[in-house]
A protein has these predicted regions:
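Alpha-helical recognition/docking segments in bacterial nutrient-uptake
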Residues: 58-176, 235-236, 240
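Hinge/beta->alpha junction and helix N-cap segments in small-molecule ligand-binding domains
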Residues: 68-77, 95-104, 126-130, 153, ...
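N-terminal helix-turn-helix DNA-binding module of bacterial transcription factors
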Residues: 1-60
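Short beta-strand segments enriched in small/hydrophobic residues
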Residues: 11, 16-21, 55-71, 121, ...
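Flexible loop/turn connectors
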Residues: 231-334
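Short acidic/polar active-site loop segments enriched in Thr and Asp
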Residues: 118, 183-185, 243
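Short helix-capping segments at alpha-helix termini
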Residues: 88-89, 208-215, 239-240, 262-268
Length: 334
């Protein structure tokens, strides 16, 4: 694999911005440092690309942010948290909304890379896809131009840095507690096939399996994240009885709560309902939703902190996992 600017910076013991300044023969770099970096470049047969020539020389202190849909509560909050943290470091941001279609995501990333950005943040695990080479090739290509930071997704690539919630473990633990409290027919509602959604589903299924319960396809329901659509789908299409609902988003849980009200099911006595992301929606519901706090603000802060370290030439872990916790309100009784 050919060397890139990250490799040269690491071998020379300098920041990637310093490598760029050496490439451009900047007077801001001492002759001693220039000689050291050039020796590494020559030894490794390194040919600078456009990224290496531009980084650090004409930095605009600007970070690109791409998310699928800013109307999504989780993503809107994440963008706000990122903007706040970046501002504390003196950085501005450019936002692109890509939508969810694969080609649209690729185009959005390509467009934002044409701007003068120092780093790129992708909000949400939808950018990981199914982790086939074709799904993530554009991410790896982007990471050859600027440092790439992925929120709530994971890609094995040395130039992509991931910060994510431990959604598998919290889902496993929550379902286990439901089972221990006597709930045996647990419905799982999800609205995405993203990395995060798959990890939540894995936690749900393994908790059932480890407690001797069968995994029932009828109790794994994919539905659009619209409250009334969730209510109607449960009412019209799910015939199997269930005594608890675990979801991948608070909107899905709110829809399940509407369904329970329509059916005259008492929550939490007859049915427990658990949301995800602990959004404002959780406290707007009646009764108020128990919901898993995925630590969105902390994840965004860690992402920006990691970014600054990378831009300064430090070596950091490529995967940072943040624990989650359940916020109990009025829709659970365990």
């Amino acid at each position: 694999m050919p060397m890139n600017i990250y490799d040269i910076a690491k071998l020379a013991g300098v920041s990637i911005a310093t490598v760029s300044r050496v490439v451009n023969d900047s007077p801001k770099v001492s002759e001693r440092t220039k000689a050291k970096v050039r020796a590494v470049m020559e030894e490794q047969n390194y040919t600078p690309n456009v990224f290496a020539r531009g980084l650090g020389l004409n930095s605009m202190n600007t970070v690109g942010i791409v998310c699928p849909d800013v109307s999504d509560t989780y993503m809107a909050c994440a963008v706000a948290y990122l903007e706040k943290s970046l501002g504390e470091y003196g950085y501005d941001c450019i936002l692109y909304c890509s939508g969810y279609e694969p080609q649209d995501k690729v185009c959005a990333v390509q467009r934002i890379l044409q701007k003068r950005i120092d780093a790129l943040v992708l909000v949400g695990s939808n950018y990981v896809g199914n982790e086939t080479p074709g799904d993530i090739a554009y991410l790896k290509e982007a990471a050859q131009q600027v440092p790439v930071f992925l929120i709530n997704g994971y890609v094995q690539c040395p130039t992509i840095y991931c910060v994510l919630s431990d959604v598998y473990q919290i889902t496993y633990d929550t379902v286990s507690k439901l089972i221990a409290s006597g709930r045996k027919q647990i419905l799982f509602l999800y609205n995405s096939y993203s990395y995060s959604a798959r990890e939540k589903k894995r936690g749900y299924e393994e908790a059932l399996r480890d407690h001797g319960l069968l995994i029932c396809e009828e109790l794994e329901v994919f539905v659009e994240n619209k409250i009334l659509k969730v209510r109607d789908k449960l009412f019209q299409e799910v015939s199997r009885k269930f005594d608890a609902v675990v979801t991948t988003d608070d909107g899905l849980a709110a829809g399940a709560l509407k369904y329970a009200a329509m059916k005259g099911i008492f929550v939490p006595d007859e049915m427990n309902i658990i949301g995800f992301n602990d959004s404002e929606l959780a406290v707007c519901c009646e009764p108020e939703l128990s919901s898993i706090d995925s630590q969105g603000e902390l994840i965004c802060k860690k992402t920006v902190d990691n970014m600054m370290k990378v831009l300064e030439g430090h070596t950091i872990q490529h995967k940072t996992v943040v624990p989650c916790h359940l916020v109990k309100r009025k829709t659970t009784n365990f």
